Amino acid sequence: LLRQTNNGVNRLASKGNIILAVPNTWLQLSVIDILSTLKEQYICVKNLQEMYQKIRDYPGSILLIDILSFERSYWDIIECLKKEDPDLSLVCLISKDKLAYVHSLEEDDACYLVEKEKADQMLLPALTRAREDQQKRLPTLNKKEVITLEKDYKGFSNGISTNLSRRSFLKASAVTAVASGVIASNPLATGMKALAVGESPVAGNEEKLVSSVCRSNCFQCCRLYAHVRDGKITKTTPAAYPDEIYTGCCLRGLSLVQRTYSPTRIKYPMRRIGERGADKWERISWDEAINEISKKFMAIQSQYGPQALVVDTGSGNYGLVHGIQGVVTRLANSIGCTRLNICYDQATGYGADRVIGGGIWLWGNEPRTMLDSKTIIVWGSNPINAQPQNWRIIKEAKNKGVKVITIDPIYSATANKSDEYIPIVPGSDTMLALAMMNYMIEHDLLNVDFMKRRSTAPFLVRKDNGKILRKSDFLPGIDAAGDDFYVWDSIANKPVLLKEGPEDVAIEGSFLVNNVEVDTTFTLLKKHVQQYTLEEASKLTSIPVEKIEYLARTYVDGPTTIYTNYGINHYLNGHLWSFAAFIMASLTGNIGVKGAGFAGLYVLHMPVNFAAVYVTNRKMANNTLPQAIFHEVVKDQKWGEKPYPIKAIFTMNSNSMSNFAQQNVWFDDILPNIDFKVVVDTEFTDNARYADIVLPAAFWFEVNDLRVSYNNPYMLYQEKVIEPLYESKPDAEIIALIGRKMGLGQFFPESMVDTEWIKVLLDSDGFRRMNVTYDRIVAEKVIRVQGSAEKPFIRGEHFFNTPSGRAQLYCENPLPRVNFGQDLTGIIEKERLPYFRPPAEAWKDSPLFAKYPLVFLQELSRFRTHSQWYNTPMLRELDPEPLAKMSREDAKARGIKTGDIVEVFNDRGRAVVKAEVNDSISTGILSIPKGWQREQFIDGCFQELTNTEVDPMSVNFAYFDCLVDVRKV
């Protein structure tokens, strides 16, 4: 219990309630000095064994621990501590430069982080809040004890508001502690200024801060300060956005210095001298490299045709000049080459586009809108790992009373921090959405007003051809702009055109219009989803009937936001889930309104002048060859029945060999048939190791660039921090060198450096109307270009990007995302409404299930974004090697223990790694977190296991639609 000493400082009444586990003698004495000044009692322990014993002896204690000073990993220590005493409160001492290592501990409500350098300011507040947590766990106290506790606590608070977040409490009480003289006499006080998260750091006399931005494809776009001393970057810290809620940085952003100065960075142009993949290279000059590359590119195109050169870009850099959307497109168009059509993470947006339009990227709200939700359903996503700044917003919403529910096959970190976790059978998400929709319709849980005003529910569909009835059906020759949709006026009891403004419209019924039989789109939808009962859904998803019913009613009781990304789209049926989910939102009015809709991917649609950068007077690149059939075309040297020789690959901002499905097709089909392969990168990735020439790219801090953000409403300027290291060059400069050597100097004048390209990109009427100019972005570094903190952007608030401006409940003309000659027989008609189709392979009824009974997943790690950061020392220390994570039941059945070397295998390939028995993994699932490179496996690679089969409509790699088994080596 809390008690109060004569000087007003709180202390614990019972001896031993503070256990001190600090092995370093100097640090231990310093902490003891603080505790003595505060008249705190404590017990010192010498090692982990003694610490565990004292925790057993004194349950409900506060453990003050230097958690990174022990040989065991901090997560192992935490797990053991929780088993010994679930009510234990932790106060962890962490050096400021190691805070990134233990970022996840901040999410633990019973754990407080204290910077060693500020222990004199932060320790007392941390201990006080830890005690407050303990009191919440105590049995009910009698009235007298409660009054005593309240009096004691008020005696300390001295005006500090207790209605604060944990972070705010520590900040505020540290200031008060200094002001009240509690620690003024402490010899450890150094006079350092405490820096609040989100405030601009203070640079030292010899240090300067340069505004930067992380440009990876986690879609977070964290704004950073690069700290520069003596011409070198010393660290990165979060830089404030004007709207504080978007300020933050994760482990990856904090470790960017190590990526910049990586000892394994590609430093010079290199030419292969051994077999591909042998990792034997010779250094060559830039002149030699550019001459050889341009000469071979021109020779190959001259002999085999312009399509024989493939320009391959991925998502490794979202800068508008040097990244995947930048000057590389100008080169591709100038030489009329083949540009691979991306086949990863396309299905979610493809399904959403059928309902709300706008293409495959424009479907999410500004993340701030989640603060206005009543419920947030995190469906098939793990933002704590994948998008930590979005998680901060979800957590803030949760702290304000918003309910957070996670639906996921894996008990993820996000599931752990949610109010409710609903496990689901992998690949059955569409079935769940359809059953929820059926239940809502059956029980009249719909927003009929929204359906009438803002959806196509009242539109009439012809029974003879499945098309929506329009004015042009009876008046041929009307152009699209003058066409209109028929609805049924329920008051006048007749068909009318929508623009005539019917008094009321029928959303259900079958009618006859000029001898044409029609149904409303909602009638078709209602009849269609009746087959998806709760009982059938429960059987296929493993979710109890009453839980599905509860989930449906909770969703309807909005406003509700569904937070999702690309987990579900990694199955062949992925687009059908988003198709169903967006229709479900449209039936219930949970879209286009405050606090409702979808979050996870918010993309700005900005008036960037890409055309001026992309377009030349040359032949445009062919962008219709999907990555999924690339290996077939290269192997056969034909596309369908037509010759289509491909002999060279030029790759930038992509690690194709690591991230394309079924890696073995590179060794079997692609590399043997390619004459020349060039890779531009910063590290020797899988892709670079199998190149003929590699060129060293400048890193993000070594160029000027522009980023239009994902998942926040800002445009950011990347100011060059340092000059390119070694002999690296900016991507745009490399492209220009090749272009000029290929005789395209008119498209790549030497005057066009990156700052000039930025000026071109900003030269648009749209930006002029917004007062966004080059001079302004350079001066301000960050500009909000959509919405405001008071009125954040809501997708579809005023209209949807569809022909009618309404949410479409029926897709009359389903088209494949990209048409590459695939067989669509019998598919188009089925795709007009969402339906459940089991995963092609990862399903219990699959012919392969008896042989390979484990669904293979690739979790997104907090330590990597896809394959980026795969070799960063700080993060490798925390996550040193790939692991095969499996359930206790599956491991026991195979005689496997944590640490055993195992082979994960199927008919396509194998991966040899260490096993980890992990209770977050459900029975029947095996997961290897993604992003590891081939060289980091004992043998094989996780990407050997996946397959290149794609859905003919979404044309998207289905990484999770995969079965494997595992055995001990």
Language model segments and positions:
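Conserved phosphotransfer microenvironments
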Residues: S61-L81, S95-K98
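Long, contiguous, secondary-structure-rich segments that constitute the structural scaffold
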Residues: D731-R776, S867-K885, E889-V969
